[in-house]
Amino acid sequence: MRTFILACFCTALGAQTLTLTFDDGPNRVKTPRLSPEDRNAALLSALEKEKVQAIVFANGIDGGDTPEGRAALGAWGQAGHLVGNHTYSHLRFTELATFRQDFLRGDSLIKGLPGYARFFRFPYLKEGPTLEARDGMRKTLAETGYRNAHVTIPTFDWLIDERLRSRLKAHPLVELEPYRAYYLESVLNQADRARVLGLKLAGREVKHAMLLHHCLLNALFLRDLIQALKANGWTLVGPLEAYDDPIYQQATTRVETDANFLETLAREKGVLPGAALGLDEAYEREKTALREAGL
């Protein structure tokens, strides 16, 4: 059963709004059930049927820098979606010069594709190991006309996808419904938490950015997820509208590892006490929840 979060902020003006963002496109790895072409087509079909515009963040690994991969990315732009930069090699940001070069190589990969948009998604949401590296990359983004595509609703779709693919390889006829139900509940709870945090931080409804991945799980269940979000009061808008929210004009003032954008701002402003929940700790919690659910 979902955990509903009650807050006294529900009278704030505006609708609860989010945009869908997909990392790691076009993801040409082999998976059970669906080919890379079928997964890409299924994602685009779900978005078209639900009349939702999204953005896919591309890199060159896993087949992205191949004729087939570029065609898959081009299909997103041709369908009216945006194509952003996720670096070429999906490197962890440990050193500025190397990371900057990989960012520029990622830009070269997508430049010229339909839907090309100067939005950048940091791999692993790591914006730099030091203040100097972070500020150096911020300068690079400004010089190249890029905007930081912040995340306010992180999800563990990638972990659920890993578990699903592993189970399908061992048991090809496994029932998918438990994975679908767990996934929808997990994402809806994450969205609820982000909404409450945004209201606390801004005193109004924030236009959120949800992090998803180009993967089998979403190829199978994206339309169900969109319908569940709509049924729970969410309005889905395009990336340009969402990232025009003034919240994204704010800049964090310190190096903050493993925290999404809203959490970082909230902790800096004293809205949230204590240290951020690291991705490693959150990952272990989600793994435990999946095991307890028998998935």
Enumerate the predicted regions with their spans.
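Active-site beta->alpha N-cap acidic-glycine motif
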Residues: 15-125, 210, 228, 244
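Acidic/histidine-rich helix-loop elements
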Residues: 25-37, 94, 165-170, 176, ...
